[in-house]
Amino acid sequence: MVAKIIDGKTIAQQVRNEVAGLVQQRLAAGKRAPGLAVVLVGENPASQIYVSSKRRACEEVGFLSRSYDLPASTSEAQLLELITQLNDDAEIDGILVQLPLPAGIDNTKVLEHISPAKDVDGFHPYNVGRLCQRAPTLRPCTPRGIVTLLERYQIDTFGLNAVVVGASNIVGRPMSMELLLAGCTTTVTHRFTKNLRQHIENADLLVVAVGKPGFIPGDWIKPGAIVIDVGINRLESGKVVGDVDFDLASTRASWITPVPGGVGPMTVATLIQNTLQACENNDNGVSA
């Protein structure tokens, strides 16, 4: 068996094109373009790359894009004050604070200070709670992007045994909620899980998000399984690989996401979708 490739790059471009078309319709109807504020504190090289890709994506679809590049010496109080101003700014529909933040700034306090109605990353407890209660509004970007990939490829998930490897607030936990909504029987594994191999060998749908290159051996994959690899790891050679041994896994799975070009592009595309949704919610008087 040779797995079919789930091409996130192509689907992400489709999503961007769809959003760009909807923005043009808004402008033609006399409405304003959605606005996204991207806040970067410090000079983390990886964060700078991520932020530049998000800003570029915004501009490509016709959003108002505002950048706030703050020095590493910025205090927590100063950052919270900026977020307060952006919460009150009628031109801004989405606020994105790039993580990680410098030492001395409480990530949780900062993320919870963002208005849930402008939380386009989907990290605010209100939005995570809505997802848990089967009434999602702004959904965490990577899990929602994965669901979009499964939907676009018409992969039926109802009744599947799904296993999520990794229990982070950004991917693992909200992903488990998305899979429940998608009709899966869902297991979340983590660093205290015993018999990890046994769980994976029983998985019809496997989502791996641990940030360790080749963490899941390919021969653990159940024949015919759907494999979603969220990991993005750069080796010393410069090669970028995922958390799953792709070469062997792709001979056993029915569908698999490559790294790069799988889940990664969908995270930014979903951020764009969420920003448009936040703008439309604002138009319609829908508040968090």
From Swiss-Prot:
NADP(+) binds at G166, A167, S168, I232. Keywords: Amino-acid biosynthesis, Histidine biosynthesis, Hydrolase, Methionine biosynthesis, Multifunctional enzyme, NADP, One-carbon metabolism, Oxidoreductase, Purine biosynthesis. GO terms for cellular component: cytosol. GO terms for biological process: L-histidine biosynthetic process; methionine biosynthetic process; purine nucleotide biosynthetic process; tetrahydrofolate interconversion. SUPFAM superfamilies: Aminoacid dehydrogenase-like, N-terminal domain, NAD(P)-binding Rossmann-fold domains. The keyword Transport does not apply. Belongs to the tetrahydrofolate dehydrogenase/cyclohydrolase family. Homodimer. This is Bifunctional protein FolD. The lineage of its organism: Bacteria, Pseudomonadati, Pseudomonadota, Gammaproteobacteria, Enterobacterales.
